[in-house]
């Protein structure tokens, strides 16, 4: 148990993307999980990479758990920070993912310089694995979210995760995978949409300190992303 002062300021880590930082009142909030969801190729991984580089430029170490096949070439193209501050775990299964989350939690306990944990993407293996035991999958889902929430709160660092989407068969809307279980654990949720002109719109759909519905536009570029009106 920790005693918390209400006068303690909110810690925020800049993402390195000006319009997104403005949207979030200064950056990713410490102590909580922020979820970014959107269709494939919408820019979720780009935001994760740039946010990681921004944290490192602020003197913080980053743990990055990758299930998407992070491109080293792309990472080095967008990152001009000291990559010795970057710890990458590539995971290949749901069990791998849980082990990586536990390792990240222990590392954050030992090293005060760790300032961000990224998981891209959280739902990849939950979506792909075919298990007959639905309750066991739900329990694992909850356990991993609990571990991430705990390390974020204890160390007052942002945890950034990405999520896949699915189409609701009843109304055709695109929703983040995991439904209520994921939504309940998130204190901040951002949706990225592709625009017909190639730009991306990022919208706050849930946040404990930012008005829902506010949005910004950006475009993916060779060396990162650029904000656009």
UniProtKB/Swiss-Prot annotation:
Residues given in the record as ATP binding sites: 38-45
Coiled-coil residue windows: none
Molecular function, one GO term: ATP binding
InterPro entries documented for this protein: DNA_recomb/repair_Rad51_C (IPR013632), DNA_repair_and_recomb_RadB (IPR011939), P-loop_NTPase (IPR027417), RecA_ATP-bd (IPR020588)
One of the GO biological process terms: DNA repair
Classification via Pfam families: Rad51 (PF08423)
Top-level taxon of origin: Archaea
Alphabetical keyword list: ATP-binding, DNA damage, DNA recombination, DNA-binding, Nucleotide-binding
Intrachain disulfide bonds: none
Family: Belongs to the eukaryotic RecA-like protein family. RadB subfamily.
PANTHER family, alphabetized: DNA REPAIR AND RECOMBINATION PROTEIN RADB (PTHR22942:SF47), RECA/RAD51/RADA DNA STRAND-PAIRING FAMILY MEMBER (PTHR22942)
Role of this protein: Involved in DNA repair and in homologous recombination. May regulate the cleavage reactions of the branch-structured DNA. Has a very weak ATPase activity that is not stimulated by DNA. Binds DNA but does not promote DNA strands exchange.
Protein name: DNA repair and recombination protein RadB
Encoding gene, per UniProt annotation: radB
